[in-house]
Amino acid sequence: MSLSTLLSLVDELQEPRSPIYELGLGLHPHSRYVLPLGTQQRRSINGCPCASPICPSSPAGQVLALRREMANRNDIHWPATAHVGKDGFQVCMDVAQFKPSELNVKVVDDSILVEGKHEERQDDHGHIMRHFVRRYKVPDGYKAEQVVSQLSSDGVLTVSIPKPQAVEDKSKERIIQIQQVGPAHLNVKANESEVKGKENGAPNGKDK
């Protein structure tokens, strides 16, 4: 391999690229905001005037094309990525190959299941059927009933759980409301009169 070809390969491998290529690939939440340099004109050492970040005819471009081709196979399983940060639990994945009606997100016990499936359809290389299932465990302290999911217009599915609120240590204290009533001395005098009457043997009924 010549020196110019080697330098070209190193230069091209350092170019940023979009992370949204593979089927159901787990993405870090911040990766959604990384955009490719698709329109930036790059220099070429080997004389290939290519406007894309990685020239398709270069060795790096051929490797990238092979990786994309492998991503369309059903037997490829990419590692899932879950992120727990200050905003809570979050999972992002590329599902651009699926329609919204072909995606399903559900909670089973303490796990989140994400499934995508479409029947056999024709593409540029023939017919293909895609299907993937991913399972994520709900972190300790998080509530499974608060799981929400969003699908962006560019095909990124985000499943998240808000961060649990801190539980305040409240003592078992209860404020008793004071009720305002009439004068208390009237009730006391009435009770004393009844007691004295019983001590003197006052008849309770009629004399015969």
From Swiss-Prot:
Residues 187-208 are annotated as: Disordered. GO terms for cellular component: cytoplasm; cytosol; nucleus. Keywords: Phosphoprotein, Stress response. The lineage of its organism: Eukaryota, Metazoa, Ecdysozoa, Arthropoda, Hexapoda. It comes from Drosophila melanogaster. The keyword Membrane does not apply. SUPFAM superfamilies: HSP20-like chaperones. This is Heat shock protein 26. The modification Phosphoserine is found at residues 44, 52, 58.
